[in-house]
Every structure is written in C-alpha cells, then in structure tokens.
C-alpha cells in the first residue's frame, strides 16, 4: 500500500531559494510530510534515491536487513548544492527504531555542506527518536535546530511531543 502524493496540491514548493527539504520515502508516508513541509516553507525538494531494491515485500525485508545492522545503504550521488541553502529539513522514516539506512548514507555524504538543519522523523510508534537525530547531527557535523517526530498509523498522522 502506498500513499499518493500529487505535486499539484502543493503550489508553494520551490518559491524560496533559501530552503530545501530532503527526504527518503519507501512507501510515500515520509514523502507526504516532506511535501507538506516544503509547501509550508516554500522550500525546494530533493529526494534521496537508493540504488538498492526498496520496493514491495522483498524491498521491505531487504531494508530491514540494513536497518537491523545499522548499515549505510548505497544511494545515488547527491545532485544538489546543499551549501547554497540557509536551511535544510531532512525527513526520514524510522526503520527498526533507528535512522533509515539511505538517510544515514545521505548524512555521511552531506557532512560539512549544510549550514542549518532540522529533522522530521516519521514512524509507526509513539517514540520521539532523539537517537536518530543525534546520529544525524554526528554524521553531518552540525546540531539540529528542531526535531519533529510524527507517528503515522492507518494513514493518520500525529505529532509526538516530549513527555
């Protein structure tokens, strides 16, 4: 099952040259959050593309293997100049209670190239996943300005606040 995201529903995307939203989405849950954030802020969008199989049931199990071992997953080379943006928002799914492997790879490649960063983490549990934010901070060599943790269950989103 996939979420459908229609770019025409988000007319403000790309209206600001100062912001960028980066995302990886296997099934569309994170893509929807990324598009909403980009539309709200006028940011441009950049999708992280894995070179591994991530689609379907086999993709689910393959991604789980990377997640369990906390391995990087090969991705396409970053094709956007990250240093030209004042603010970058990274949207990531949580896999096996940790940062998704393609986003881990992106952060490693993007180290030292991002001026200011914030995170949106999408998952199916009630956690905040500060561990994933700390890992991204370490990989990027920068401290995030904010973290939003969003639970998605049965197609409904709910922001998880600190307790």
Please name every model-derived segment.
Residues 53:
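Positions that flank functional sites
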